[in-house]
């Protein structure tokens, strides 16, 4: 989609955070299959995590419920993070690990403390891609009203969280390190 500016982790690993892999699933795209992101021009600043996907706080343990409503995150959450060992270039042809966080499809985040992809990248010489996906009713919800609401079967499936993780695989064709 374009060039990225990342950062260097304390352990020396290269890190890119908050890279959009789909259009935000809000408004008319809520409860629809993910759509490709809009390309950006210039360099994208990939230095901050994207938001956790909208979820209840009872299963989002490390996240703070700032307004006390029992929920955290945002519907605009389809972002991924990439971690690579220091001094890596495309010529190294390192393996890529695609990491999908746990949480029983009801909670979680690709930047959950304790799941630091930079450690794996640096220690095992692997590129780690950590993806966010819609959880709970935003990711798996079906209603008869959706039957005529989409352009195709994926929009009517009720499996948007799974489709998010499939959509995020665009990196397999696009990932290069310079």
Language model: regions and residue ranges:
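Non-catalytic accessory segments of hydrolases
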Residues: 1-160
């Amino acid at each position: 989609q374009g060039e990225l500016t990342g950062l260097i982790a304390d352990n020396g690993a290269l890190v890119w955070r908050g890279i959009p892999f789909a259009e935000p699933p809000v408004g008319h795209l809520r409860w629809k299959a993910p759509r490709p992101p809009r390309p950006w021009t210039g360099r994208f600043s990939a230095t901050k995590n994207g938001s956790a996907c909208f979820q209840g706080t009872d299963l989002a343990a490390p996240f703070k419920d700032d307004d006390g409503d029992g929920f955290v995150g945002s519907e605009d959450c389809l972002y991924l993070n990439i971690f690579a060992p220091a001094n890596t270039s495309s010529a190294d042809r390192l393996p890529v690990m695609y990491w999908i966080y746990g949480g029983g499809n009801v909670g979680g985040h690709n930047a959950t403390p304790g799941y630091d992809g930079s450690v794996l990248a640096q220690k095992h010489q692997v590129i780690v891609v950590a993806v966010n996906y819609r959880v709970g009713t935003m990711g798996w919800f079906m209603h008869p009203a959706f039957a005529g609401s989409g352009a195709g079967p994926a929009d009517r499936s009720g499996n948007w969280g799974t489709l998010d993780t499939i959509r995020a695989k665009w990196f397999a064709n696009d990932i290069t390190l310079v």
